[in-house]
Every structure is written in structure tokens, then in C-alpha cells.
Amino acid sequence: MEMAKEQELILVLDFGSQYNQLITRRIREMGVYSELHDHEISIEEIKRMNPKGIILSGGPNSVYEEGSFTIDPEIYNLGIPVLGICYGMQLTTKLLGGKVERANEREYGKATINAKSDELFFGLPSEQTVWMSHSDKVIEIPEGFEVIADSPSTNYAAIEDKKRRIYGVQFHPEVRHTEYGNDLLRNFVRRVCNCTGEWTMENFIEIEIEKIRQQVGNRKVLCAMSGGVDSSVVAVLLHKAIGEQLTCIFVDHGLLRKGEGDMVMEQFGEGFDMNIIRVNAQERFMSKLKGVSDPERKRKIIGNEFVYVFDDEAAKLTDVDFLAQGTLYTDVIESGTKTAQTIKSHHNVGGLPEDMEFELIEPINTLFKDEVRALGIELGIPEHLVWRQPFPGPGLGIRVLGEITEDKLEIVRESDAILREVIREEGLERDIWQYFTVLPGIQSVGVMGDYRTYDHTVGIRAVTSIDGMTSDFARIDWEVLQKISSRIVNEVDHVNRVVYDITSKPPSTIEWE
């Protein structure tokens, strides 16, 4: 990943903590660019990146375990401020000549520390609540260090070598449970590392446009557009950079939400004057899905067919050298570090053919999802599009459980439109992470008017979450749920029952298939 030289950087080294991405995000929220890299990064690479500061993350291991993660000690001699968090502090202590030993039992949870008012704790109260999570403990600090915080359980809750600007904390400042964690990180970033905090979406756009123009020159770029937030932001950013050199292919597989295909063409084709080729492939997809009920087979068919359709359309274009993708920074992190956890694959449509000879452009691969939304707003994309609901690549194909038919798709499409309309009317769009309807394939007895019915059940799924990795069902007001239910059974044909999914993730996933 190339960075503009004028951009301030805080480098976070990964030792396997579940909070690693939080550190990076907290720094970015301060207006300072931050990247997460593997702990095995070379000294030469660090020098090339020229960070203003380095943070060593926490991790689940002991510094004394065989094969435990370590770093080149030369990092401490670069003249760059270093902050070690939990495992990062223990490793710093060990590498610089102090002593660390295994604790009798793992310390996990809230604790109270007493801090001195130095650079790290500048302007903060001496007594603070912090979040501890460690199995080793420091029993002797290295030469040149002094204690700047203690707690009832340890004399070394935080340490510093003021001369070399090396710090360590035995708690997690990046988590919300640590009372003044953000303030501590801000002191490190601003006071110790002297960062100015000028990283904004506005200057990100300027830097990225210049990079795109340098990479592309006068050649052409192809972008697969789904109408989702990521591909839409990529397309608008590229169009702003290279104009008519960009061509977008929008594959309409017939599994979209109500009015979605027309919306893409109207908002982006006409609204942004972009060159978008719409491929109406509904019949092709439905014929391939006929009789298929297994969810994995459905996913593979939809993914593969998307690739074939895109490949066919791309072959009709000439002189295209680049393919643009909406890869996010979370994707880069999950695939780019040895300590990353394996996470269930997302529903996004599968990769494009390996034999397509394009050079990749991934202009948002340094951004998190919320930053992509902020970028979209800065680019002038209407707010209601930027804040659209996440939508899986296979679309409604995995919200109709079992075999997909046109009639079943229509039920999901109409009921989902009602759900989204009511949520919007009630002002709940920003409060709920994701919400949609599903067709479980269950029919039940009902009474409508004077007649007995035997019709479909519609399920409502609405969850709250921060990142989608875990979630809880949304506590929607009963009157709102009643309004949604009443409208669905009265306005959608062949539905006589509505149920609400009150399961968390885990054990369930957000999507039903």
C-alpha cells in the first residue's frame, strides 16, 4: 500500500489481540492515519514508512511461550516513540533487560490504577478505571525506565523511558471499559509523537485521486458495480479522478431489492453521468437456480454465474487495463497478518476469473466501513444511499430459504420494502445495524375475513452491532413491530403470519442462509 509522504502515520504492530483493529480505529478517529502490520515487519520497511510513532499491540500469548511473537529490538533504537500495550509492554520489558514472569492467574476485567501526571497521563485524574487482560506480569523494569502508574495488583501498571520516549501500559486503553483510554492514546499521538491530526476524508480524496491518475495515466478502468456502498464509492471516486476512462458493469441478476436496479442506473448513471452497462441477466440466473434448495449450492451458482456474465461483458470491451474493486481495510487485515483470526467468509459474490489480465485498483483498501461511508458523503453521494443496508452478494437468493421462485422473491421483495419504509419513518435507520425480511419456507393456518388460509410466514431479522462480527437482536418497540406486521399481512399476497427473530450472534448468524 503506497502512502503519501506528507501523511502522518502511527504504525500498529500486530501480536494477535482481539482489539487490534480498535487501536487503529481510535487513532484514525483523532485525525491521524494509522495502519496495522504484522509484528515481523522489517526495520527497513519501518524506515521506509517513516511513522511518527509505533504501538505494540496486546496478544493472548506469554512472552515465555515457545515460538512467542517478538520484534527486532532495533525498533527501540530508531528514535521513534513506542507504546507497548499489555503483551507489548511485557515484550518491551523483556527485550530491554527487565524481568517478566507468569502470573499465578490471568488478570481479566476492570481495575483501578493510580497514575502520575506525565506526558502519557497529562491532564488526567490520578485514579482511573482501566481494563486489564494479561497472563504475564512485570516484576522488574529495564534500566532507564520509571513507574508512572500502579494498581493494587501490580507495581508496574504503566512505565516510561522519557529519554527514549518508550512507554508501556499493562491495560487496554483502546477499549471503552478503560475510563480515559482515548485521552491516553491522544496524549501519545499528539504530545509524544507530535502528530497534528490533519487526516480527513477531504485530503484522503485529494491524495487518492492523484494516486489513481498516476497509476492509470490515459488508460481505461473497469469496475464491477453492485449498487452497494463499497462499489458505489469506488466508482464515484474513480469517476472523479479519470472521468470517461471508467466503465462500470452492473449485473442485474434478478435477486435485488425492490427498485434497486433502476435506482443504480438513475442515481449513478444519470446523477453522476457515469458510463454504466446494465446487464439484465434475471432469466439466466433463475434457470440455473431452478430446483436448487441447498444454500451452499445456491451461493456457488450465483457467484459463478456472476463471474461468467461479467466475463462475457468485459470481453466486449477493448483496451481496458485495470479492474477496480471495493476491498476494505478489514479484508486486508484479515488476509495480511499471520496472527489474524479466520473469520467466516462473507456473502459477497466470488472473485473474478484469474485469467482476466487486469491490473487491480483498490482505492478504499485502507479504509474501514464507517470511513467509506464518510468518504461517500464527502464525494457527494446522497446520504440515503451511503447509509443503505448491507446486502449480500447472492442477494435475495439467500433470503428465500430453499428453492427460489419468482413468487417467493416477490414476497420477500415486497415485505422487505415495507420493513425498510417503516424503519425509516420511525427514524430508526441509524439505530439498527441491519434489518431485512426472510421467507423461511413455512406455511401455516390463518383466518382472513371469513376464510381459512394456509399461507407463508415472513421472518423479520433486525440486529444491533458495532462491526457485524457479533450482534444482538434489536429491541424494536412493540407498536412499531405491530405496524410492520400489520402492513405485511395486509399488503403482501400469500402471507398470513409474521415472526421476529430474537437470536443473537453467536450462536446464530445475521443472515439465515
From Swiss-Prot:
Superkingdom: Bacteria
Summary of the function given for this chain in its UniProt record: Catalyzes the synthesis of GMP from XMP.
Name used for this protein in its record: GMP synthase [glutamine-hydrolyzing]
Catalyzed reaction equations: XMP + L-glutamine + ATP + H2O = GMP + L-glutamate + AMP + diphosphate + 2 H(+)
Oligomer status and interactors: Homodimer.
Gene name of the record: guaA
Pfam family membership, one: tRNA_Me_trans
Pathway entry: Purine metabolism; GMP biosynthesis; GMP from XMP (L-Gln route): step 1/1
Listed EC numbers: 6.3.5.2
Source organism per UniProt: Staphylococcus epidermidis (strain ATCC 12228 / FDA PCI 1200)
Protein residues bound to ATP: 226-232
Domain GMPS ATP-PPase intervals: 199-388
Listed GO CC annotations: cytosol
Lineage: Bacteria, Bacillati, Bacillota, Bacilli, Bacillales
Any GO molecular function: GMP synthase activity
